[in-house]
């Protein structure tokens, strides 16, 4: 006790609060540690961290989030800051009413501040989950570009996001913009081979509609060489499209070969809709 004021010293309260936490008396731990946070120092930072952890055990995530935010704001101990920042971002993710909101910003900030953290892989996973599940592809791309050292997991997500933006542009008949996105996806295509192959296919479709037949043929061939799924509709249609390109340049022998290949593939497939098969006639 501080004899002059007859109140417990901060370090004594801190140790008592930790004792409550370690013995799983979480409500007492949070209450006691809250009395420690009167100074801007390492003791306060660690008290806030354990208050947050206590509130998590009490299923009071909003209170936990606020405690973690306080601990993460301090630079007194960088390991404590790292743990608090991770838990703060996670609480935001779990309590956010916006699918693509504050939690993404918090995860970005964490990865930029602690790129080598043992939590970095989990944070990357949470970000990828948000990117792909919300389908807010433009916002996701901007988010990734704000991360100084994105992980391979996030770069694979970027590859897929660029592909999705490309196919959206294609669906809107904006073939030039589709090519920009798809070629960016191809440029970082080492993370997912099938996404890269599919990007080549849709580049071929875009070039075809722009009457750029040489590039269309090149990319349809790149798709055929790269795809890991040679028995699906796109594989058959790539041969069909190459047949038409050969036909237009009056290479009837090669056109015939591609059309025969298309027919063989078609017969092996369960179903290709009639409008799709006849769309170029």
Across the structure, where does each feature detected by a protein language model lie?
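TPR-repeat structural position
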Residues: 26, 61, 98-100, 137, ...
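Short solvent-exposed coil/turn linkers within tandem alpha-helical repeat scaffolds
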Residues: 1-10, 35-45, 71-81, 97, ...
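Structural motif corresponding to the intra-repeat A-B loop/turn of tetratricopeptide repeats
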Residues: 23, 58, 95-97, 134, ...
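Single conserved hydrophobic/aromatic residue that forms the stacking wall/gate
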Residues: 270-281
């Amino acid at each position: 006790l501080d004899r002059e004021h007859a109140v417990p010293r901060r370090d004594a309260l801190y140790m008592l609060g930790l004792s409550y936490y370690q013995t799983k008396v979480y409500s007492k731990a949070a209450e006691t540690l809250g009395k420690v946070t009167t100074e801007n120092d390492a003791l306060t930072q660690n008290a806030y961290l354990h208050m947050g952890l206590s509130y998590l055990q009490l299923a009071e995530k909003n209170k936990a989030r606020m405690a973690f935010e306080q601990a993460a704001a301090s630079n007194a101990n960088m390991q404590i800051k790292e743990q608090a920042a991770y838990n703060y971002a996670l609480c935001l993710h779990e309590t956010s009413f916006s699918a693509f909101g504050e939690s993404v910003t918090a995860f970005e900030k964490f990865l930029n501040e602690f790129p080598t953290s043992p939590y970095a892989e989990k944070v990357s996973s949470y970000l990828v989950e948000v990117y792909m599940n919300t389908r807010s592809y433009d916002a996701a791309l901007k988010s990734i570009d704000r991360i100084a050292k994105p992980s391979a997991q996030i770069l694979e997500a970027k590859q897929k996001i660029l592909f999705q933006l490309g196919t959206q542009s294609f669906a809107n008949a904006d073939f030039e913009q589709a090519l920009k996105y798809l070629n960016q996806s191809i440029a970082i295509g080492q993370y997912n081979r099938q996404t890269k192959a599919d990007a080549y296919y849709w580049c071929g479709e875009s070039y075809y509609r722009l009457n750029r037949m040489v590039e269309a043929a090149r990319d349809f061939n790149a798709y055929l060489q790269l795809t890991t799924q040679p028995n699906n509709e796109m594989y058959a249609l790539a041969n069909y499209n190459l047949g038409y390109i050969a036909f237009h340049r009056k290479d009837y022998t090669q056109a015939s070969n591609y059309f025969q290949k298309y027919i063989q593939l078609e017969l092996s497939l369960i179903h290709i809709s009639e409008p799709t098969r006849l769309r170029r006639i």
